[in-house]
Amino acid sequence: MALFLSKRLLRFTVIAGAVIVLLLTLNSNSRTQQYIPSSISAAFDFTSGSISPEQQVISEENDAKKLEQSALNSEASEDSEAMDEESKALKAAAEKADAPIDTKTTMDYITPSFANKAGKPKACYVTLVRNKELKGLLSSIKYVENKINKKFPYPWVFLNDEPFTEEFKEAVTKAVSSEVKFGILPKEHWSYPEWINQTKAAEIRADAATKYIYGGSESYRHMCRYQSGFFWRHELLEEYDWYWRVEPDIKLYCDINYDVFKWMQENEKVYGFTVSIHEYEVTIPTLWQTSMDFIKKNPEYLDENNLMSFLSNDNGKTYNLCHFWSNFEIANLNLWRSPAYREYFDTLDHQGGFFYERWGDAPVHSIAAALFLPKDKIHYFSDIGYHHPPYDNCPLDKEVYNSNNCECDQGNDFTFQGYSCGKEYYDAQGLVKPKNWKKFRE
């Protein structure tokens, strides 16, 4: 900018000087013509190569004009160069603004994590827990440690909306054989966004308190919103591609003799679950329509090989309430980090259903995974014996059951029971059901 101004000043000086010289010359020539005697004037032949005073004046005027025009041309040239640079910048900005929407699919944001097949997955266990849940958490840790983590250790991240007590941290650190990390949730991730009418939300909770489970709970709604849209943004998870969600009071019934994270990575799976179930419709009256409206506005996010048939029996017109139970998730964090999911969550969040209804993170995660991913990227861990009150996932395959020293009752397996969505999942994926699956429907 300084150089540009200096050049302008130089051009102005040159032009001003030329004008002054011209005026002085004209004045001088005028006086000269007045005082030249006619005899001297007649003695010179101005047509034989010499220049008359009048012609000299004209010549000097022309020279001054040329000098001025040259300076102006130079200024225009540099102005043009400056304009060109500005135009280029504006053009680039315009092109960027008019550019088509990013055509990357959700999988394009996930596949880079598959490239690490030769190395250990960037993975961790993650638990959102309160200090008062220490006893239940230690029970869960014991199962995870004995069934898998001692054989295939990974870091464990513990998150809380309040500071962990020293007692809590000491007990957990002692119980976990691998690295542990403790994190606090940012306040804005566990509070009301500015667009939520808190008076209205409180009235809805009061009315729902006796109508359905957690209907009157404020903290449960914050938890569902956090698990839906924020846990994967926590700074302690930034270095990881994979996570296994573990909650207090869960059980693992069988030995897990392989690295599940490595299996997910090598087989290019994105979302894994153990239990599928129907949601309480009264808690999510507008979730499906809101989701379908989002898909209509953003059809590019709907994967062509999606798992819509798991969610809907009429190609999306209505929701059959099926979802993956999110208290157990082994999944790729980049699914939630993708533009599709970020925009989807933002749409849901502004709709207000986490507070005005009681939208759970399980149906939110399930709808997104089933629609944004190719269906072959979703995996049912039928070999992992798992319990979260009150349901069990118990391997029905006898060989798997025996070889993994399973301790569960196969008769209690929830997969094909009436309230489960195991049948819907098997049908949607084209999987062959166990021979005795129908007995669980009785």
UniProtKB/Swiss-Prot annotation:
GO function term, MF aspect, one: alpha-1,2-mannosyltransferase activity
Q: What InterPro entries does this protein map onto?
A: Glyco_trans_15, Nucleotide-diphossugar_trans
Which residues does the annotation flag as glycosylated? Answer: 197
- Whether Manganese counts among this entry's keywords is yes
- Main location, first listed in the record: Golgi
Q: Does the keyword Manganese apply?
A: yes
Q: Ranges in the Lumenal compartment? A: 31-442
GO CC, one annotated term: Golgi apparatus
Region (Stem region) location: 31-118
Q: Where is the composition biased (Basic and acidic residues)?
A: 85-95
Span list, region Disordered: 68-95
Q: Which Gene3D superfamilies match?
A: Spore Coat Polysaccharide Biosynthesis Protein SpsA, Chain A
Active site, renumbered:
329
Q: List residues in topological domain: Cytoplasmic.
A: 1-11
Question: Topologically, how does it sit relative to the membrane?
Answer: Single-pass type II membrane protein
Remaining remarks: Present with 13000 molecules/cell in log phase SD medium.
The UniProt entry, under PANTHER family, shows: ALPHA-1,2 MANNOSYLTRANSFERASE KTR1, GLYCOLIPID 2-ALPHA-MANNOSYLTRANSFERASE-RELATED
Concerning its family, UniProt says: Belongs to the glycosyltransferase 15 family.
Summarize the protein's role. Mannosyltransferase that transfers an alpha-D-mannosyl residue from GDP-mannose into lipid-linked oligosaccharide, forming an alpha-(1->2)-D-mannosyl-D-mannose linkage. Required for the attachment of the third mannose residue of O-linked saccharides.
Q: What is this protein called?
A: Glycolipid 2-alpha-mannosyltransferase
From what organism does this protein derive? Saccharomyces cerevisiae (strain ATCC 204508 / S288c) (Baker's yeast)
